[in-house]
Amino acid sequence: AILSNGDNITLTRVVELFETEQVVRPFERQIVRNETLPEGETRLVQAGVNGLEEITFRRILEDEVEISKSAVKTVVLIDALPEIVMVGAQASYTPLNIPGTLAYLAGGNAWIMENSTANRRIIVSTGDLDGRIFSLSPNGEYLIFTRKSNKPADEEINTLWAVRTRNLDPKLISLEASNVVHFAEWIPNTNSVAYSTVEPRSAAPGWQANNDLYRVSITGGTPRKLLSTSSGGVYGWWGMSFSYSPNGKLAYARPDQIGLVDQDAGYLKPLLDITPLNTHSDWAWIPPLVWGADNESLFFVSHAPAPAPITSEESPYFDLTAISFSSEATVALVQSAGMFSSPSVSAIRSTGREKIFQVAYLQSIFIEQSDTSRYRLMVMDRDGSNSKLLFPPADSNGIEPQTPAWAPQALEGQTGDFIAVVYQGNLWLIDSGNGDAYQVTGDGLLSEIDWK
């Protein structure tokens, strides 16, 4: 600007200052429901401690008058420690006698029930179980499970562990295996566990499957390779799963195939090609698969075709199917059951000279949206006859996809066997004979179950 005679000039002194202040970070209050405490009772688990942070402010002063103040940097000096209060959630559910050992995962911890649903005992209290693997040994004496890794997810997803369920002071046993996402299971009639691994990745879904299989003894030693790393067929990047028969035969399922594993020679023996599902997403569908209690049959979910113009890979229909090795027959037992029907077989019962067992499975409520649908628990005879709805009732919300867990044997005087399911975060037991359903837990934290 050009100044003229008589113009006034005002000079403003501007000062920029940086100052730091230490500010208290108040602790949060966390409430944890616990069924070991009576309803309404509270217990302080961890006292809260305030944290401390250092904030750097940028101040602008004009002629010693502050016109702005803004935070430009925050550094946490001391992390706040949350106050954790345990609140009793012990509801007055009638105790039930149960056979065997029932294990369940709640709030990242492993619990077991024995003899009665009133007898509950925590066996793993680390709070970091991720639920990918949660399986009892055939005799219920050991539980194998996975724990979240402390390393970044693109370096290590989880680690595989075991614990003896019958010790009053259980000690965790590291199986020296990591990145176990799809499968780990006790090998029948041995003291060993079989497992399959993946390689962590930063991109979705978070891993690249190895489609391998290892065997490791619970007593230690070097794992033995049963299957070498392979591409795994169509959508093999997602992975594959396996299932042991009661007498130790091994079947496999992958997105495009089911078959048997030669555990001595280390190769796959395909039984049936499956039309792989195109999910148009970063996950793949693996057919749920289980052996019959007779060691001579396989129950699995197959991908059924759809009418034109829907392509076979995009068909929304999935049938519950069985293979009988004794009759060399493959039969669709339930049409349009849903992709997560997850069959589960009961223990064998003897009726005269005949040995029979039942099959529990899930029926999708919305047949053409079974990937997002809720389900209802059904039961049928092994040949697909006498199918009936068990739980929940038709006028109630369905259950989330899961594999039902049969009781290892029936109780005296019981019309059927108990089947355990997770419903709305709680454990329910359903009598397969008369359909009576019993709620066992009430804290809403339960996510996985197994029963042996």
Give the role of each language-model region:
Residues 89-452:
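Sequence signature of WD/YWTD-type beta-propeller architectures
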Residues 1-94:
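Extracellular modular ligand-binding repeats in secreted and cell-surface proteins
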